[in-house]
């Protein structure tokens, strides 16, 4: 199938599920900042007037969880007249956190394949499969649909925070459909933006008039700025532009829908363009391979594409709880590779150390929250963990590895 339309979505930081991801990662940041060896599996639930923290945590850090939760909600924008039934200052915050299971801790602390190599002594925190992906559709080596959906969501939140469109409220979603011909992106077929808003805008009360006003404002202040540097741009005549298709979006956030950590895993990764192992990221410390190994898989895939050894690459890793080395490594270049997939796998095993402790050390995952002033993982909890132009993410820095792969691959050419 070479001619098709592919669609991906993103959501803003005010989406109920994303509120939860940010709170869970804010907890992780706070704990790692004080105690880099913290073991964290923090889940968050939000509903009208309620936030619940649950999960398992083992740490020497002392954190005021209630204050932290309220601060995150406030920074997102749920406060005062914009709260919509979920006010940072008055919502109930319940904390129900246990310690990590000693059975899990034992497997992480001392791997099954223990030896004199320190990196072999830390086992994976769970079994599982993780995928990483990269392609040459964008400068950041991400699929265009998810990249553009994130751009729109980021810009939508920006104009709200800057009060450029003072009727906007925190909840929102974007969706982008891209036309592909011969497997390459050629045009933007459809842009959809659903954004929460005040019931009245500058004296307008008619539902259709309000929707038309929002549509005009979003094209000017969101769509155009978010796409101005792209080679493929939206066309006001040819690109279908949908805004709040139900007519209005006044009730939103946790008042409209309950939220839960880990329910936007496709938004967090590749927008459905590549496979996903099923494990969420937010609220998990780096010993959880759901997170750290997914970052490593992206690192490997991006290095391959950056080295021009393939136009697209998907890497699968698998782990067993308590075992340091990956059970399997699989790479697929979708018939775009310049060397065989077997040879690529050989290079991956030689140039990438994919044991959990080695990944943590390579990316400095335990210490980044402290180095970044207590906010690192939380920033990844909205608008994707990969291809972020606005964040300094270690798994996106592939120049050195790409150069190594490019040089080493010459023996196979």
From Swiss-Prot:
L-methionine binds at residues 56, 100, 257, 288. Its EC number is 2.5.1.6. Mg(2+) binds at residue 17. One of its GO terms (molecular function) is magnesium ion binding. It catalyses: L-methionine + ATP + H2O = S-adenosyl-L-methionine + phosphate + diphosphate. Binds 2 divalent ions per subunit. Its cofactor is Mg(2+); K(+). Belongs to the AdoMet synthase family. ATP binds at residues 15, 171-173, 248-249, 257, 263-264, 280, 284. GO terms for cellular component: cytoplasm. Homotetramer; dimer of dimers. Residues 100-110 are annotated as: Flexible loop. InterPro entries: ADOMET_SYNTHASE_CS, S-AdoMet_synt_C, S-AdoMet_synt_central, S-AdoMet_synt_N, S-AdoMet_synthetase, S-AdoMet_synthetase_sfam. K(+) binds at residue 43. Pathway: Amino-acid biosynthesis; S-adenosyl-L-methionine biosynthesis; S-adenosyl-L-methionine from L-methionine: step 1/1. It is found in: Cytoplasm. CDD domains: S-AdoMet_synt (cd18079). Its main location: cytoplasm. Pfam families: S-AdoMet_synt_C, S-AdoMet_synt_M, S-AdoMet_synt_N. Catalyzes the formation of S-adenosylmethionine (AdoMet) from methionine and ATP. The overall synthetic reaction is composed of two sequential steps, AdoMet formation and the subsequent tripolyphosphate hydrolysis which occurs prior to release of AdoMet from the enzyme. The gene is metK. Keywords: ATP-binding, Cytoplasm, Magnesium, Metal-binding, Nucleotide-binding, One-carbon metabolism, Potassium, Transferase. This is S-adenosylmethionine synthase. One of its GO terms (biological process) is S-adenosylmethionine biosynthetic process.
């Amino acid at each position: 199938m070479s001619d098709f339309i592919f669609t991906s979505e993103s959501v803003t930081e005010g989406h109920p599920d994303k509120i939860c991801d940010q709170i869970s990662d804010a907890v992780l940041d706070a704990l790692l900042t004080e105690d880099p060896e913290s073991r964290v599996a923090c889940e968050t639930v939000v509903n009208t007037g309620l936030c619940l923290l649950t999960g398992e945590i083992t740490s020497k850090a002392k954190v005021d969880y209630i204050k932290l939760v309220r601060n995150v909600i406030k920074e997102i924008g749920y406060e005062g007249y914009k709260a919509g039934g979920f006010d940072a200052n008055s919502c109930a915050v319940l904390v129900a956190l246990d310690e990590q299971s000693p059975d899990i801790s034992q497997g992480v602390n001392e791997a099954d394949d223990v030896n004199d190599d320190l990196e072999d002594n830390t086992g994976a925190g769970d079994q599982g499969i993780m995928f990483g992906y990269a392609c040459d559709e964008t400068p950041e080596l991400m699929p265009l649909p998810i990249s553009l959906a994130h751009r729109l969501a980021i810009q939508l939140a920006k104009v709200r925070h800057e009060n450029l469109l003072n009727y906007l409220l925190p909840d929102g979603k974007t969706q982008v459909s891209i036309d592909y011909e011969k497997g390459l992106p050629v045009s933007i077929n459809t842009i959809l933006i659903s954004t929460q808003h005040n019931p009245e805008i500058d004296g307008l009360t008619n539902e259709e008039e309000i929707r038309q006003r929002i549509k005009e404002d979003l094209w000017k202040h969101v769509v155009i700025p978010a796409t101005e540097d792209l080679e493929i741009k939206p066309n006001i005549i040819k690109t279908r532009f949908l805004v709040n298709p139900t007519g209005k979006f006044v009730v939103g956030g946790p008042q409209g829908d309950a939220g839960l950590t880990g329910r936007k895993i496709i938004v967090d990764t590749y927008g459905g363009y590549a496979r996903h192992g099923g494990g969420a990221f937010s609220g998990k410390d780096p010993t959880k391979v759901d997170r750290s190994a997914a970052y490593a898989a992206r690192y490997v895939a991006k290095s391959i594409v950056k080295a021009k050894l393939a136009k697209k690459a998907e890497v699968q890793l698998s782990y067993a709880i308590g075992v340091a080395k990956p059970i399997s490594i699989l790479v697929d270049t979708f018939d775009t590779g310049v060397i065989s997939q077997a040879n690529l796998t050989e290079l991956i095993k030689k140039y990438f150390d994919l044991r959990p402790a080695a990944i943590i050390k390579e990316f400095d995952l335990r210490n980044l929250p402290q180095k970044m002033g207590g906010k690192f993982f939380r920033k990844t909890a909205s608008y994707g963990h990969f291809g972020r132009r606005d964040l300094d993410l270690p798994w996106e820095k592939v120049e050195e590895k790409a150069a190594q792969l490019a040089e080493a691959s010459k023996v196979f050419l």
